[in-house]
């Protein structure tokens, strides 16, 4: 029985170490040596191989055997089963390091079924023979005895060993931080009796060698408790982690450790600049009855207006007031000069001084744009509205016979060209706000057409022009609007024509209405209707 079980026990002893490391994802210390396992370690499958005529061959446990061996303790000496307390005590789980403890997230603490001792792991990585000891800050841990591995385990393929990687890189891949690796190396060196200087030199040399072997390990993200762990090594072709400011890193550290967030310092709020008190309005207009007892400041006297309008504490207000006073003074001077020029002007028709007329409404000038002769507004309008002269004579100047298109009313006499142009522009802007009485909202006819200064506006709801018979509207409605007489107030005469023209217009209106009613049964063609409409429009535009 012992010979038959010896290979199986050897495989189990070798698979316990490989299975714990490959199945759990972390490295574990070698299992404790039992007497049966130690006795059977030296026994190999040589007798069987010699009997069959085969060369001696080392047997390496497969993945399935490793997994089974990692989940099953080695049998006791003599092939018998272990005692009940040893099987149910769960001591085999203490040989496996807790993966949550490696990441700093184990919630069980000292009650955890898995091992929290890191000294055995460090010795197995470094090949040291020192006995593991319990951590002072983690409480007492189960200590196991370690012996050198057998020849079969030592001659395992190099794929099972991670010594090809540098110490810092390999430890970082399995979850160790840089501080834990340094502390473990210092403790093991101190146990062997090295001095502090030798330890420092060795640590510096190891750090330089590891930095040369690990690609980008110095740019790795620092492990933060409570945040997803990313390891110590940076992938050679992976994306680089974004840089964080020290303030953000401190906030993350505070959040992971459960500490209160740092309260940001409030930004200093600028103090509002107090507005100066307004000036006393009574003192600015004349005299304040309160005098020095007034709650409001009294302004300084302005040289231009002579009032207490300058604020003693506000330089901007003083500058603005002086500028306004200068502009007002310039306007007053221009008005004074205009009045002085107009004082002795005599009308060329009535031969009276314009400013000395009895009726104040007649004290206005009628300025012609093309000449500089002086006329009062009433006389020049009477001259231009006379019918006993030809149109070219009545629209021209009575003295120089230079024709002018319009007369500009003004209270002051203007001679210079620039002032005349400014006066004409102001006159046109004022007239454009008034409705033309000849246009009559689209129902009349303005003889000036597009040259009229008054506003030609259609009633609300109409377009720019009334609906035409060929533009979508009914012809009867169009001609009814055109031929219907316009209702005006008494005293307003829209059409100045003779009695004969009124009678002709009335007869044409009646004839057109009758023709429109008989259009469906008449033999008029479309060309004749268009010709009739054209002749009527031309007649009305000439005689209205």
From Swiss-Prot:
**InterPro entries xrefs:** MKRN-like, MKRN1_C, Znf-CCCH_4, Znf_C3HC4_RING-type, Znf_CCCH, Znf_CCCH_sf, Znf_RING, Znf_RING/FYVE/PHD
The record's account of tissue expression is: Mainly expressed in mouse brain and reproductive system including testis and ovary. Ubiquitously detected at low levels throughout the entire embryo, but expression is highest in the ventricular layers of the brain.
Q: Which reaction does it catalyse?
A: S-ubiquitinyl-[E2 ubiquitin-conjugating enzyme]-L-cysteine + [acceptor protein]-L-lysine = [E2 ubiquitin-conjugating enzyme]-L-cysteine + N(6)-ubiquitinyl-[acceptor protein]-L-lysine
Write out the GO cellular component annotations: nucleus
Enzyme superclass (EC): transferase
Q: What does this protein do?
A: E3 ubiquitin ligase catalyzing the covalent attachment of ubiquitin moieties onto substrate proteins. Acts as a key developmental timer that helps ensure puberty begins at the appropriate age, by inhibiting premature activation of the reproductive hormone cascade. Epigenetically regulates GNRH1 transcription by disrupting the binding of methyl-DNA binding protein 3/MBD3 to the promoter of GNRH1.
Specify the protein name: E3 ubiquitin-protein ligase makorin-3
What organism does this protein naturally occur in? Answer: Mus musculus (Mouse)
Q: What is the lineage of its organism?
A: Eukaryota, Metazoa, Chordata, Craniata, Vertebrata
